[in-house]
From Swiss-Prot:
Reactions that this protein is recorded to catalyse: UMP + diphosphate = 5-phospho-alpha-D-ribose 1-diphosphate + uracil
Family: Belongs to the UPRTase family.
One GO molecular-function entry: uracil phosphoribosyltransferase activity
Cofactor note: Binds 1 Mg(2+) ion per subunit. The magnesium is bound as Mg-PRPP.
Protein name: Uracil phosphoribosyltransferase
Cofactor(s) this protein requires: Mg(2+)
CDD domains the record matches: PRTases_typeI
PANTHER family referenced in this protein's UniProt entry, alphabetically: ADENINE PHOSPHORIBOSYLTRANSFERASE, URACIL PHOSPHORIBOSYLTRANSFERASE, CHLOROPLASTIC
Keywords: Allosteric enzyme, Glycosyltransferase, GTP-binding, Magnesium, Nucleotide-binding, Transferase
Amino acid sequence: MKIVEVRHPLVQHKIGLMRNAALSTKDFRELANELGTLLAYEATADLETEPHTLPGWAGPITVQRIAGAKITVVPILRAGLGMLSGVLSLIPAARVSVVGLQRDEETLQPVPYFERLTGRLEERDALILDPMLATGGTLIATIDMLKRAGARRIKGIFLVAAPEGIEAVKAVHPDVEIYTAAIDAQLNDKGYILPGLGDAGDRIFGTRVG
């Protein structure tokens, strides 16, 4: 499995800012989108290009363009929506597929409640968006959905990932690539990442208590 912890200074600076528990909803949301853009930049670095000739200002010129890649971006509800605008700013022609899975707080297992995938997935690469890769259960369930629908290549983009979640996904889907701003220390007994970011969904949407 390809696992990329993006060490670019801008990425590390921004994820550091997001760890501040006193950060406003506005700032947290903006940083999530900015990191979505930066991480998507890394995740798409291996897209193939092809030469294309067009009329330049001084005559015909040959340039490079993406070689027919079709991409669907897959935000996992609801927190993944907080990274979507940033990714689409980089890949505006991408189709958006949406998956909803909610973690059972007792079993820590994902419970699906929504699935709306774009058509012709067998022709597309999929970029899954979720701020947190914790136990890996939600990601595994999402990958299962995408593979059943025929997605040809799948990558996951996360703000923070836990080693336990990475290993769980690796055991089931070793062909999937993971891109993250940080691999944190561990999960606690509730399945939350430490030191983590807190509840990313609540922080993005301003629904946290207090």
